[in-house]
Amino acid sequence: MAKFNGLRPYLAMALVVIALFALAPPAAAQSGGPPDYRQYFGADSRLVIWVVAQLHLLFAAFVLGVPIFALITEFVGHRTGEKRFDKLAHDFTKLLAASFSTTAAFGGLLAFSLFALYPTFMSHLSDIFTPTYAWYGILFFAEAFTMYFYLYSWDWLAGQRKKWHLWTGLLLNIFGVAIMLIANSWVSFMMTPPLAQVNEETGEVIRQGLNVLSLEWTGTLWQAINNPLWSPLNIHRFIGNVAFGGFIVGAYAAVRFLNARTREARAYYDWMGYIGNFIGVAALIPMPFAGYYMGREVYSYSAVMGNNMMGGAFSWTFIIQAILIGALFIGANFYLWSGMSRIPGSERYLKYIKWLDVVLILCFAIWLTPHNLPLSPEEQVIMGGQFHPTLKFLGLMAAKNAVINFIIIATFLSFLLYRRGNKGERVPVSQQGVSSKIVVLAGFVVVALVLGWYAFRLFTLNPAELDLSPNKAVYFTLPAVLLVAQILAGAVAVALTLKDRGVTGQMIYVAVTVLNSVLILGPYGFTVMTQANPFLRNIAVAQWLITMSGLVFITAIDIVLLRGAEEIGAIRWGQMTERSQYALILLVVGVVMLMSLMGYIRSGLREDWHVFGVLRDTSASALTPSMAYMARVIAGIVAAFIALVAFVFWLAGLGESGEVEPGTMFPLRAAPQPSASQTITEPAGAGGND
């Protein structure tokens, strides 16, 4: 097994070298050119690319996400001196190394398949992006060497040299993110290519870009990279990759927990599963907003593509997406609630769980309610039309925006209850010193500046920017006023916290957050939809800022409130129910399904275009699959990925016992040190684990 591990870097390097040679334009292009399309043994070329690309992206998401929190965890271990954090970061990196060569293999297969099956399209793309291919290869080499050095130098760069190991981890993350940015430029260009604009009368070029008629690119490489969808896709994928990596780690820890045979191992893998779930949920919380930003840019570029996304052939895929997102939030909350059983004193807060559960279920029901239903003519007559007279309103974006904010707030409150479970008497803020007051004030200042900036933006917004008449400016006032009210509520919370009434301040700020973001701006969104529809996107931004301000500011207060608080008892790591571990495993199944579905939506929105609106796909498979066909393909991808991950992790674990060294989770009792006049009466070896 050690020999196999040593060969991994060389296998990955070989695949990249071969792929780079494959990226060179084929010689046949110089003599008549290659055919537009080819097939592998008669297989559907689009299906081949779909499956290979999605499997590559899933592994790549894990490879990008894991180094981020591995570095953070290692840094925490370095600063605190706790052995368990360093071991956790090392275990994260072992999982990364096990997946890296598989990612490279699928990447090489994808490159071969694209150039073999779609030579004309890839030739067109290469005319624009050839320099990025070289940079991609160089960065991949750099990432591979850095990753294996980061793994194998763990013990060598320990102690006084630890800072150099941390710098290596930072470099690894920089290379990984840079690779993602380059790859995102290719796929985002296919959806939103910057088009050249020419004055029809004078022939003067107004804007450089892609010529629709000649397919000639007249812009710069940076213009092609920085296309309208590039930044939203970068944000969405980066956050998604972190969430994905966290849930994968959580599932891995759950399997290890279920097979652990010692108390130390069960405690360690229980803690590892908690960290993985925490990372997944923390990244999952901003995901809906990142997705909304991306969808907004799709609409801005092409109303046709945007309407098709939410109201056309792809509308029902978003109902499936809603089900999966809701299931992830409910599963993550269930795990947190189950975890309270291992926290002494948490029974004080169990009475609140049922109310959070009610909020989550009701919001989930609204979140997945469709606007229109696939009805027969007879059913439409019975119901009085295509839309349900009442439930149709729950299918609109105004309702969706409100409930997703409520789901996020409820999830955040679950974590606050979990965090507060074993805390007893608190140290008054007035007795904590200057640093605590700085934390509270700094949190408030950051929140106030962001909310104040957007409130000013809404107060001064010109309706013409949204293609609205001047009289529509009246609809801009309410959200701006609510943003100011949120700032004032923050000031009240600060004053109460400094007066040792921080819990009351938190409750007030949570109540105002729910009131403004959900109960006022939610229904107000329906008015905006009918009277000033383009402004609905600004309503969504205001809701998001209010919700995120609540999360950030309440966390700042909570850190101060619990600083130095008495503990009712230590968390009993390892004393966790088995069903909670199955929840972690189901979470990873759900997130793999969600990422596969969203990959299909993003790519499928182009329909029969290789490059939307410019280069049409004229192959036999240039069609939008049915929902049933899409579901079968995604189910196959999910099953294949989970099987591959299980196999890769099993292979990487050969030769390892899976047990945890004593002292990792539970400190060893130190033997008493006798003075010069004392003798040791305790027999040797009497010290053991707590």
Specify the residue positions occupied by each region the protein language model found.
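N-terminal secretory/membrane targeting signals
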Residues: 1-29
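Transmembrane-helix bundle segments that line or gate the permeation/cavity pathway
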Residues: 19, 64-69, 100-121, 134-163, ...
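Short, strongly hydrophobic alpha-helical membrane anchors
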Residues: 21-51, 687-690
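Short aromatic-rich membrane-water interface segments that cap or initiate transmembrane helices
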Residues: 46-57, 124-138, 203-212, 218-240, ...
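Juxtamembrane membrane-water interface segments of multi-pass membrane proteins
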Residues: 68-94, 112-124, 149-165, 249-275, ...
